[in-house]
């Protein structure tokens, strides 16, 4: 029956301590099966302890079932293994045991059984710091006058009755404990259910049941444990069994003497061969002693694999010897030339032999944890391996320091490169920004219509004060009359203060000097501008324009001179003549009068050249 959960274990415990069994007995095969379940750890030890405690508390009213439950507890304690014993010695279960001892006075058989279990636990684990609560409960019961059975005689090793073989705790490692191969995504790790070691797939591909550990289903085991169980099942001869057990022991804990000797010789030959490439030192042939020959003969008789390995190493030694002799003969035939000796390269990295020694030492130390101390101290091969590993500690520290310095240097260089790249990016951004600004200020905005661009500059001369001066028109250049009139009108509009000053200085004639309106006769009007007058007036306008332009270039503001009134009086005539060519509705005809004119009338011709009235000036400005 395969039990893997606490509920299944409860059912099995009820079956072993059934009420149908008389006289407080129990079903012994089922009880042993329960102990195998506890020893194999298929159920957690704490859960197992709670299952037994629950059965004890539930059967407190039935003396027979209570007795069978404690008998089952005694069997499980002595066959359940150390993890289960730790849970039994905890406060949770020991308080229940103390309560039963103090309560059961009528049932002597049950009381004696519980006292016996407690006393055996006290004698076995009273010096254990992890299980010291048993001693506290024992002292408490002694102080209350509880007497324990004195007829119990324990052997020299009181823990022997509780020493049951259990599956070993799993060991974690990053390499196989047999071939020392590193674990990776493809080379997965596997634990042996017997020894708890970690191995690769190649060395843990066997599956067998482990009845001595309470495991009756095939589980994964390593090659060493598989050979051990295979030898137990197929015990053909005592000699074969003894030899294979010796091989397993040597593989697990130390290197055999002959194998260590062969490895040492192979290393010496390889070192001498490497030295011969740089120097002409002869290789001393290895002379095997008689003891070694006898040992080799024994090994050849016992193990064919070891025999093949020895032959292979001897063959390699012979080949190295022949190769060195050939090199020596070729050097003697060639003329002697001074060959430059290569400079020795000091390498701080560990060699393959040192790495193998470290891995082998680590795996052996893990396996030696479960062995007694005297075997560890007496193992000379393990001590030699430890000395070799400790000798390589200085080189390992130096190599680690060298790698750390290189790492720090690379980190510093990476930081400098990132800082330089940031500075370079900042400079590029500044350069691009300056190029964009220069393009904005240097590139002119070309208008879509050049004629509009020209007319805008001509129609807005008031804005030319902030720009370079206009080119002065020569007398022979052609200029339309319409443009001249436009410029004059703009000038009149752009200088309102001048017109206001002109209005202030206008001399208004008295009503006595003006002729009455009744003498004016209305008649059809003639053309306002004859051809000759138009030409004369155009020439006069060009000259006035040139003079006004010259004055505006010299000084942008009007200059107050002595003849300021005369200049002001002349400007409205030009404005009236060209800007507003209006035709009067009727022509003024002056009737002949017999009244003689005064002498000053010839000096001021009012009829022909009359200055504009203030009303006309206001109309012009509007």
From Swiss-Prot:
* Keyword field contains Phosphoprotein: yes
Q: Give positions of region: Disordered.
A: 236-260, 317-348, 462-622
Bias type Polar residues, positions: 462-500
Basic and acidic residues bias: where?
A: 317-328
- Superkingdom of the source? Eukaryota
**CC per GO annotation:** endosome; endosome membrane; ESCRT-0 complex; protein-containing complex; vacuolar membrane
Record key words, sorted: Endosome, Isopeptide bond, Membrane, Metal-binding, Phosphoprotein, Repeat, Ubl conjugation, Zinc, Zinc-finger
How does the protein associate with the membrane? Peripheral membrane protein
| Outcome reported for the amino acid change (mutating residue 193 to A) | Decreases the association to PtdIns(3)P containing membranes
Q: Which PROSITE patterns match?
A: UIM (PS50330), VHS (PS50179), ZF_FYVE (PS50178)
| Compositional bias segments (type: Basic residues) | 239-249
UIM domain location: 258-277, 301-320
Q: Where is this cross-link: Glycyl lysine isopeptide (Lys-Gly) (interchain with G-Cter in ubiquitin)?
A: 294
- Cell compartments where the protein resides: Endosome membrane
Give the protein name, as stated in the record.
Answer: Vacuolar protein sorting-associated protein 27
Source organism phylogeny = Eukaryota, Fungi, Dikarya, Ascomycota, Saccharomycotina
